Amino acid sequence: MKKYITLLLLLLSCTVSMAQIAVGIRLNNPLVYGSSISPLYNEDGKKFNTYGNWGVFNSGVFARIPLKEKHWVLHTELLYKNEGTHLSGFDVPDKDRGPYYRESLYEEKRHFSLQYIDAPCLLQWEGKRMFRGYLEAGFSLKFLTHASYTNGWFNAPDENVTPHFNRLVLTGQVGGGVLWDIKRVMITADMRMSWNLTPITGHLVRGVDFSESMGFSLSLISIGVGYKLGYKKK
């Protein structure tokens, strides 16, 4: 095992430019961040109407590691991320519905919220000017910390449903942005979208079937501010 670890560290030292590693903080604009989980079905197989979960603040830290190959950068993050979805439908089995049930029943409103620690690892391709653009793509592991369910119509309190969801989810991520490289400091602004590659659960949760669903999130503006380690004034 020690030999494998030593070999891995040696390979990294051959491909990473240590002098330009930057670490910093990253946060999104909650007004232009949204997530959704769909499609969702009830126990009869009827599809719920789903709506995006907007206006959520996410933040965390990042490390940006230029590779010795020109234009390529390894970008890693550790973020708090909130995802969820709103849904509505008639949660009454078909056998219990009368011919005019839509006139006598209220449409039930629900909300699922999932909180993750998100750890993306992205490969970036960038220009070389002080103010430059970049593209990025990669994968992420999301670690579930808490999941809650709310039946909004009856003003019920949030219910902890964490045990019903998978603790670990793999996602794909793509995006792009611009970077301002100012001596010791770099500032980034980007947009990014991600989607689940593995299921968030494999069974019904409070009468909602997630078996065919896919989680999706979109952040139109996120800002990062980083500090270069080992920077030497030229």
List each language-model region with its residue ranges.
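Transmembrane beta-strands of outer-membrane beta-barrel pores
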Residues: 27-33, 80-84, 139-145, 193-199, ...
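Extracellular loop and loop/strand-boundary signature of outer-membrane beta-barrel proteins
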Residues: 43-50, 104-110, 157-164, 207-213
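Short glycine/proline- and aromatic-enriched beta-strand/turn motifs that initiate or cap beta-hairpins
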Residues: 19-66, 70, 228-234
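Predominantly the C-terminal beta-signal and adjacent terminal strand-loop region
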Residues: 36-38, 164-234
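Outer-envelope beta-barrel architecture signal
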Residues: 19-23, 70-74, 129-135, 168, ...
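Outer-membrane beta-barrel translocator domains and adjoining extracellular loop/strand segments
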Residues: 35-44, 86-93, 147-156, 200-208
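Residues that define the transmembrane beta-barrel architecture of outer-membrane proteins
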Residues: 21, 53-57, 113-117, 131, ...
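Membrane-embedded beta-strand positions of outer-membrane beta-barrel proteins
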Residues: 23-27, 76-78, 121, 135-137, ...
